[in-house]
Amino acid sequence: MAAVAAATTSFSFKDFFKSFMLVELVKGMALTGRYAFRRKVTVQFPEEKTPLSPRFRGLHALRRYENGEERCIACKLCEAVCPALAITIESDVRADGSRRTTRYDIDLTKCIFCGFCEESCPVDSIVETQILEYHGEKRGDLYFTKDMLLAVGDRYEAEIAAAKAADAKYR
């Protein structure tokens, strides 16, 4: 027992020199100094932007046909396929027998941006745009209604159509 205690309390001159001269501290400062003058890899986000992937999935939008009629046929496939249950759809039958949505809501606080809604849509009505920067000060600000989604689609239709055309050969 005494031998174990003596072995743990032995202190060599080499250990004393390392602790007295702060060798580990100097090594750490030298490493920091080497990296201090290298090219920076950090991006200062609001001022600098990195390129987005062509398949980036951002803010949702509802599209219209060229004649102004909304594309959604109320098939509710996107609502059924959504793993986060973020989409709510209500529909009515029109006088001509076709269905159209009366309510199309997406709760972006639930949405995981998987893109299943876009993939399942048979008429390319719901799409995910390249819009990365959107925010809300209250929880309700991230609850997008049909009118809000149509407004996003109307505003960015040219970019959405170009992205769809560029990605068509991969689908």
Curated annotation (Swiss-Prot):
Residues 63-92, 102-131 form the 4Fe-4S ferredoxin-type domain. Belongs to the complex I 23 kDa subunit family. It is found in: Cell inner membrane. Its EC number is 7.1.1.-. InterPro entries: 4Fe4S_Fe-S-bd, 4Fe4S_Fe_S_CS, NADH_quinone_OxRdtase_chainI. Its main location: membrane. [4Fe-4S] cluster 1 binds at residues 72, 75, 78, 121. It catalyses: a quinone + NADH + 5 H(+)(in) = a quinol + NAD(+) + 4 H(+)(out). GO terms for cellular component: plasma membrane. The keyword Aminoacyl-tRNA synthetase does not apply. Keywords: 4Fe-4S, Cell inner membrane, Cell membrane, Iron, Iron-sulfur, Membrane, Metal-binding, NAD, Quinone, Repeat, Translocase, Ubiquinone. This is NADH-quinone oxidoreductase subunit I. It is an enzyme of class 7 (translocase). NDH-1 is composed of 14 different subunits. Subunits NuoA, H, J, K, L, M, N constitute the membrane sector of the complex. NDH-1 shuttles electrons from NADH, via FMN and iron-sulfur (Fe-S) centers, to quinones in the respiratory chain. The immediate electron acceptor for the enzyme in this species is believed to be ubiquinone. Couples the redox reaction to proton translocation (for every two electrons transferred, four hydrogen ions are translocated across the cytoplasmic membrane), and thus conserves the redox energy in a proton gradient. Binds 2 [4Fe-4S] clusters per subunit.
